[in-house]
Amino acid sequence: MPETQRREVPRLVGDELTTAVSFLDFQREAILRTCEGLTDDQLRWVGVPTGTNLLGLVSHLVDSEFWWFHHHVDGDAWDGDFDMNVPSSVTADEVRQAYRAAWGRSNEIIRRVGDPDALTALPVREQRLPLRWVLSHMIAETARHAGHADILREQIDGATGR
C-alpha cells in the first residue's frame, strides 16, 4: 500500500467511549486499507501455514463484531463460526460491505448503551462484562489482526503502512 495511505493515530479529546470507538474505527479502517488495490486471488492468498489470508481476516472480524457487540452486548442470537475460509462464491466486496455494516451496527449499540460500566446483556463464560472490557478487547483483537494483515500484504506485493 502506498505511503499516501498511512493515517495518523486518532488525536482527539473526548469522553471514554468516543476515544475508544475512534481507536477501534482506526484499526477497522486499517484492515480495509491493507486490502485496497488487490485482486481476489491476492486477497485469498495464503501466506502462512495456518491458512490465514486477508479476506479471511476481514470475515473473521465480521464474526468478532457480531459475537462481542451484537451478541454479548446487545443480546442478539449468534450463529457464526469464526471461520477464516471465505467461499469462492462470496466476493471480496461482499465481505468488505459485511464488515462495514457489522461495525456500523456495533457503533450504534455502543452509542445506545452509552455507559462504559454497563454490563453485557449476555454473560461471557458465566460473567457479564462491562462495555469498557469489550471495547478494550476488540481494539486489541482488531489491532492484532491488522498487524497480521500488514505482514500478509507485505508478502504479497511489498507494500507497507497502516
Placement of each model-derived feature along the sequence:
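Acidic/histidine-rich alpha-helical segments that form the ligand environment
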Residues: 86-121, 130-139, 143
